[in-house]
């Protein structure tokens, strides 16, 4: 049997593509464009895992397909290389994070090239390259000039052991840090913020203009969290103080029986009575130790302390006790709520716990038993009695505005983006603080502001980044003699990834971020493929920066990514014991088709789980490429199932894909190739071209491969293979298995040219039509024969063909035919006696 040698074929074609710049981005202005983008990776020390190539293979197939269809292709790759892991490694080993990062990038690039992706490496970007982050800094200065980057004292999640603040997303529910499991405390610090809230409405509205999965759009909508309601002002009894509450249900104001302020609310200390001062101070201390996530957990027990003060309900003059409780966050809304316990579960539980009044203002339910959270007509509500929800909201807003105690208000859950990190390994923020109290942005002519090389990258301990220790970099003097200090905070890893897709379009431009004409030519990105874990933050931040650049006239489109696709996760083989605990693969043995724990002998259940080092089930693509070849890995990952499904890795599936490619190789290299078309494969070949073309376009790669298998099976039944069909088939499989595609193309054509630019095959519609049809012949209601006849034969012709058939004649010999019923294209029924 013939097998192809991937160890010879794959490096040969990879060298050919590199030497000939086969995948250089097309610049022919007469061609349509196609921009296929992968979410660029963080180059970790662990290297590529088999999950990475799934998305990369998908965009590569699309790029190769569109290239053959005559498009200019932009298909680039780069590195999101700033970030905490490199800094942590550098601190642990004493190495420079830049050196560590460069080594990791070289390894990633080697692994990626071994998989045969058609990237244009002339466009490679690296977020840690000063020539790249010059423009990240330039964008920051534009945000600063527009008032969209500002400094504020904000409570942050401070981790003493890490010497930095961390984002809400990096705090675990138990209030410790995701990295290291260290205690997290809330403390106010001077931070840089980006005013993403100024773009909230546009970020929401423009989701309608993009072709994204609805689930991702919903996640962004929920994150932005638009709600329309009213602001209501409550005066504090016996003081000149007041506070504002935002509510989406101003119609329930008659049912507000108490108010709750966040422990951090500015008013708390001013209104707390002497009797309550100690209890309030103690509660505030406890609250500062909890993360926002822990504080707002619905399942947790409600805690709170009365301030001793009362607010006056503006609509009925009733006194409402003012409490503080940690489930109200200072960073959300106004940091104060009016509680309507009859119609809100959290307020109801709080009121029951602390014996506060519960007054129903909507008809229905029994508020002694539980909060009534459905809609009903208004009761106990004065001028709103008898009204439904919409009418009552409108009437109450009208009343609040007329009385000067409130107004209609649209709010968003979205918060401004905390943009500073107290770390070394990030882009320096290009701002100088002068001793006269002013701050200025570093002028464009002085960008990039390069990150200084320093041995001492440990956190400073003062809450500033390690850059505070680099005195000669830190201290500057103006021409007029005024001294200044550079900003010591660095940007978060999100910064470089918020605009990298723009730099690929014009990566070597030293004068501007990218040329306007090139941006016009290539934007928006046609397809963006990556993991759903970036659904909210990265995509929201990139959309925000894009809109700012649109307003500045830098980019020509409102949205960066026209179509988004999230590939599923490739799960590892893993095993569970009877308690449901996962068992590492090196502790498992297989006996008679079942799996057992090596140490305990317990039979285990196979259960796919996320690949992880601890379960020892991470599959390294290097091993797969060595044993089976890159083409096998590519075909297997596309054939596992739908691209957006999460599916378990299987060695058997990998072997199956390799066997299929060997059959393809044998078909083209050992079958007699002829210039004469017998017509036997007309239908299946044209069906295959049509199906593969449509399915690749729709990213249904698994069904496209299934159709290629159908063709191979059909072709193997024939003695000879028509040359045009052999070539067309090789073109169809080349995007999936590009090394094998190139090798077989040379076997058929000896052209010496890459298959990459050969025009994609077309199909003949007339060959898809069935000219023959199978009919059944029944005698006494039982099927006695199946005949293939020309389509649309008349009843008379069908009867003639059926009665002439040998099997039928044997059945009816010596019998009387009572009648013959013929149904064209279906059956002939013969009634005999």
Curated annotation (Swiss-Prot):
- GO molecular-function annotation terms? aminoacyl-tRNA deacylase activity; ATP binding; leucine-tRNA ligase activity
GO terms of biological process kind: leucyl-tRNA aminoacylation
EC id: 6.1.1.4
The catalysed reaction is: tRNA(Leu) + L-leucine + ATP = L-leucyl-tRNA(Leu) + AMP + diphosphate
**Motif interval(s): 'HIGH' region:** 41-52
Q: Can you tell which superkingdom this protein's organism belongs to?
A: Bacteria
Q: Where is this motif: 'KMSKS' region?
A: 610-614
Give me the residues that bind ATP, please.
613
Q: Which InterPro entries match?
A: aa-tRNA-synth_I_CS (IPR001412), aa-tRNA-synth_Ia (IPR002300), Leu-tRNA-ligase (IPR002302), Leu_tRNA-synth_edit (IPR025709), M/V/L/I-tRNA-synth_anticd-bd (IPR013155), Methionyl/Leucyl_tRNA_Synth (IPR015413), Rossmann-like_a/b/a_fold (IPR014729), tRNAsynth_Ia_anticodon-bd (IPR009080)
- Coiled-coil stretches are none
Keyword Cytoplasm found: yes
Q: Which GO terms describe its cellular component?
A: cytosol
Task: State the Pfam families in the record.
Answer: Anticodon_1 (PF08264), tRNA-synt_1 (PF00133), tRNA-synt_1_2 (PF13603), tRNA-synt_1g (PF09334)
Keyword field: Aminoacyl-tRNA synthetase, ATP-binding, Cytoplasm, Ligase, Nucleotide-binding, Protein biosynthesis
What is the annotated localization of this protein?
A: Cytoplasm
Q: Which family does it belong to?
A: Belongs to the class-I aminoacyl-tRNA synthetase family.
NCBIfam families according to UniProt:
leuS_bact
Protein's recorded name: Leucine--tRNA ligase
- What species is this protein from? Streptococcus pyogenes serotype M1
Q: What is the lineage of its organism?
A: Bacteria, Bacillati, Bacillota, Bacilli, Lactobacillales
């Amino acid at each position: 049997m013939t097998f192809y040698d991937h160890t010879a074929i794959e490096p040969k074609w990879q060298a050919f593509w590199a030497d000939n710049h086969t995948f250089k981005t097309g610049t022919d202005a007469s061609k349509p464009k196609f921009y296929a983008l992968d979410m660029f990776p963080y180059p970790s020390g662990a290297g590529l895992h088999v999950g990475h190539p799934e998305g990369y293979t998908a965009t590569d197939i699309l790029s190769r397909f569109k290239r053959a269809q005559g498009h200019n292709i932009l298909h680039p790759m780069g590195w999101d290389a700033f970030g905490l892991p490199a800094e942590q490694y550098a601190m642990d080993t004493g190495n420079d994070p830049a050196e560590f990062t460069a080594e990791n990038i070289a390894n990633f690039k080697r692994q990626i090239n071994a998989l045969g992706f058609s990237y244009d490496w002339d466009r490679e970007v690296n977020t840690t390259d000063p020539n790249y982050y010059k423009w990240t800094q330039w964008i920051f200065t534009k945000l600063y000039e527009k008032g969209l980057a500002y400094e504020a004292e904000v409570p942050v999640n401070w981790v003493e052991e890490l010497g930095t603040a961390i984002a809400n997303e990096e705090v675990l529910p138990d209030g410790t840090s995701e990295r290291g499991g260290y205690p997290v405390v809330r403390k106010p610090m001077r931070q840089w913020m980006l005013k993403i809230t100024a773009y909230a409405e546009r970020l929401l509205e423009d989701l309608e203009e993009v072709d994204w999965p609805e689930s991702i759009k919903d996640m962004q909508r929920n994150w932005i969290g638009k709600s329309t309601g009213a602001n209501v002002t409550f005066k504090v009894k016996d003081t000149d103080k007041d506070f504002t509450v935002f509510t989406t249900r101003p119609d329930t104001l008659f049912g507000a029986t108490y108010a709750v302020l966040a422990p951090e609310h500015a008013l708390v200390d001013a209104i707390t009575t002497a009797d309550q001062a100690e209890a309030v101070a103690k509660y505030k201390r406890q609250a500062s130790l909890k993360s926002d996530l822990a504080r707002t957990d619905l399942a947790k027990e409600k805690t709170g302390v009365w301030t001793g003060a009362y607010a006056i309900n503006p609509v009925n003059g009733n006194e409402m006790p003012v409490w503080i409780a940690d489930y109200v966050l200072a960073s959300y809304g106004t940091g104060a709520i009016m509680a309507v316990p009859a119609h809100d579960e959290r307020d109801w539980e709080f009121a029951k716990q602390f014996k506060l009044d519960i007054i129903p203002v909507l008809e229905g339910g029994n508020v002694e038993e539980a909060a009534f959270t459905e809609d009903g007509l208004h009761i106990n509500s004065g001028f709103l009695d008898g009204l439904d929800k919409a009418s009552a909201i409108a009437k109450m807003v009208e009343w609040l505005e007329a009385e000067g105690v409130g107004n209609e208000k649209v709010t968003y859950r979205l918060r401004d983006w905390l943009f500073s990190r107290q770390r070394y390994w990030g882009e320096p923020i290009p701002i100088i603080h002068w001793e006269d109290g002013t701050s200025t942005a570093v002028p464009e002519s002085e960008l990039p502001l390069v990150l200084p090389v320093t041995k001492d990258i440990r956190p400073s301990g003062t809450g500033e980044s390690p850059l505070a220790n680099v005195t000669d970099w830190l201290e500057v003097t103006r021409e007029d003699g005024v001294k200044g200090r550079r900003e010591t905070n660095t940007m978060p890893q999100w910064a470089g990834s918020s605009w990298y897709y723009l730099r690929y379009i014009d990566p070597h431009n030293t004068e501007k971020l990218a040329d306007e004409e090139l941006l016009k030519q290539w934007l928006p990105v046609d397809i963006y493929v990556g993991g759903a874990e970036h659904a909210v933050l990265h995509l929201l931040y990139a959309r925000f920066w894009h809109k700012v650049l649109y307003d500045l006239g830098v980019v020509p489109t409102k949205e960066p990514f026209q179509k988004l696709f999230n590939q599923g996760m490739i799960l590892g083989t893993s095993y569970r014991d009877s308690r449901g605990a996962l068992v590492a693969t090196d502790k498992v043995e297989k006996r008679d088709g079942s799996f057992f724990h090596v140490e305990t002998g317990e039979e285990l259940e196979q259960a796919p789980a996320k690949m992880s080092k601890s379960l020892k089930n991470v599959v390294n693509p290097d091993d797969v490429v060595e044993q089976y070849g890159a083409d096998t890995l590519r075909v297997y990952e596309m054939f596992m199932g739908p691209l957006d499904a999460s599916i378990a890795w299987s060695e058997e599936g990998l072997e199956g894909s390799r066997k299929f490619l060997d059959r393809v190789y044998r078909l083209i290299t050992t079958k007699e190739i002829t210039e004469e078309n017998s017509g036997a494969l007309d239908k299946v070949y044209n069906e295959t071209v049509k199906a593969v073309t449509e399915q690749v376009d729709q990213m249904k790669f698994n069904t496209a491969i299934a159709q290629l298998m159908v063709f191979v099976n059909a072709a193997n039944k024939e003695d000879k293979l028509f040359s045009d069909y052999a070539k067309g088939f090789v073109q169809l499989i080349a995007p999936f298995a590009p090394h094998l595609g190139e090798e077989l193309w040379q076997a058929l054509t000896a052209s010496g040219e890459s298959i990459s630019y050969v025009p994609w095959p077309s199909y003949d519609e007339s060959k898809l039509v069935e000219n023959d049809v199978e009919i059944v012949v029944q005698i006494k209601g039982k099927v006695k024969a199946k005949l293939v006849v020309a389509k649309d034969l008349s009843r008379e012709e069908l009867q003639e063909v059926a009665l002439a058939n040998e099997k039928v004649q044997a059945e009816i010999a010596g019998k009387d035919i009572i009648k013959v019923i013929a149904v064209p294209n279906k059956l002939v029924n013969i009634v005999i006696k």
